[in-house]
Amino acid sequence: MADDIPARRENWAEADFKGGAKSVIALKSGHVLVSDEPAGFPGGAGGENAGPTPTGFLAAAFAADIPVILQRIARERGIALDAIRARVTIAWNPRGIAGLEDASPTPFEAVSAVTLTTAAPDAEIAALKAAYEGRCPLYNLLRKSGCRMVEDWTVERG
């Protein structure tokens, strides 16, 4: 099975700026997304709220990645997960994005609330969590940037 997995995989996105804070983004997959800022966003570029902000997309990508990685690991280990729910909050200092010298634009905290519905024993859940922390690309990208990672795991017995 490991021989079937390539050593490199790429994804790409191309943003076409439409003015204000709006961009239309084409993805390698053929999907098209719109990114924008709310109108009147303090320090913003004058958006129309036509789509999520770029940092909103970051939170969405991380939230979507959590169940994908957990289910993959669970399947490999024979752990039955009846449901997976992930809520992610990413905090950053908008003063950094505005270019103020006293602030960094790098996200400083990522909070993930993960709820699993499963009959798996606690030891299997602990091993699943440890494997997830080592294998989730976005978790590791944020962690290695210095972002404080806060996790709240809940297990509902199914």
Give the location of each predicted region.
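Alpha-helical metal-binding/catalytic segments enriched in His/Glu/Asp
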Residues: 65-66
